[in-house]
Amino acid sequence: MSIHFPFSIARPITRVIAAAACVVALLPAASRAADLLDPRSLTVAADVPAKQARAQILAARRYGTFWNTGDATLARTALAADFVDRTLPAGREQGVAGPLAASSTMRAAIPDLHCDIEQMIVAGDRVVVHLHFRGHFTGTFNATTGSGQSIDFIATDIYRIDHGRIAENWHIEDNLTLMRQLGLVG
């Protein structure tokens, strides 16, 4: 006796596997958690629920990886649509457009710009990150063209995370060191 099914059981499973493979293949490589920067040191306050901590860490890792790669998709994923820069530098546009423009400017001057997350601290709805930037000034910044000099400076950011995205950012960069390395100040 033979039993016939109106459809093959293997066909739906094959379709699911094929669909999943397509989705993974279409994702930008750095959008997968395994491809994001890991902090060298991570401290999470004991009173932060695990699910909340994971979402906050993911947003901060995406944003750190954006600074490391220049991948605008990561910034758009990490930042809330109504993102506010609370320490907005003069001339920088408010909102998501601000960091995108800043990254483009930095990469025009320092094409091999690399960022590490040295420390990350999660407390309440805040994440504090200590970033370390390195590269070589081989491009142009304002009217100055680099001659390959090394760039090595730090920044510290405080993010307020809302619904898994960075809603606000307070940041300070060691701009004096950066400007000296660029040869713009003595």
Regions found by a protein language model. Give the residues of each.
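Bacterial N-terminal signal peptides
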Residues: T14-P28
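Residue-level detector of alpha-helical transmembrane segments in integral membrane proteins
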Residues: F5, A21-C22, S104
